[in-house]
Amino acid sequence: MNQGKIWTVVNPSVGLPLLLGSVTVIAILVHAAVLSHTTWFPAYWQGGLKKAA
């Protein structure tokens, strides 16, 4: 482990939830930004336009 000494400063029971929580928050923010600033992403989630028969 390259940065193994960090666990002598921060307890893993505190550090790991903070790390995973911050990654989750960043992922949600990126998805929200893409969803609100593009036109193709919401259409992709809706499955595109249905053609009339």
UniProtKB/Swiss-Prot annotation:
GO MF annotation list: bacteriochlorophyll binding; electron transporter, transferring electrons within the cyclic electron transport pathway of photosynthesis activity; metal ion binding
Subunit structure: The core complex is formed by different alpha and beta chains, binding bacteriochlorophyll molecules, and arranged most probably in tetrameric structures disposed around the reaction center. The non-pigmented gamma chains may constitute additional components.
InterPro entries registered for this protein in UniProt: Antenna_a/b, Antenna_alpha, Antenna_alpha_CS, Light-harvesting_complex
Keyword Cell membrane part of the UniProt annotation: yes
Membrane topology: Single-pass type II membrane protein
Native source species: Rhodoblastus acidophilus (Rhodopseudomonas acidophila)
Key words of the record: Antenna complex, Bacteriochlorophyll, Cell inner membrane, Cell membrane, Chlorophyll, Chromophore, Light-harvesting polypeptide, Magnesium, Membrane, Metal-binding, Transmembrane, Transmembrane helix
Main location class: membrane
Function: Antenna complexes are light-harvesting systems, which transfer the excitation energy to the reaction centers.
A single cellular component GO annotation: organelle inner membrane
Membrane-spanning parts: 15-35
Taxonomic lineage from the root: Bacteria, Pseudomonadati, Pseudomonadota, Alphaproteobacteria, Hyphomicrobiales
Residues that coordinate or bind a bacteriochlorophyll: H31
Periplasmic side: 36-53
Family of this protein: Belongs to the antenna complex alpha subunit family.
Any one GO biological process: photosynthesis, light reaction
Subcellular location: Cell inner membrane
Protein name in UniProt: Light-harvesting protein B-800/850 alpha chain
Keyword Metal-binding attached: yes
Cystine pairs: none
Ranges in the topological domain labelled Cytoplasmic: 1-14
PROSITE patterns registered for this protein in UniProt: ANTENNA_COMP_ALPHA (PS00968)
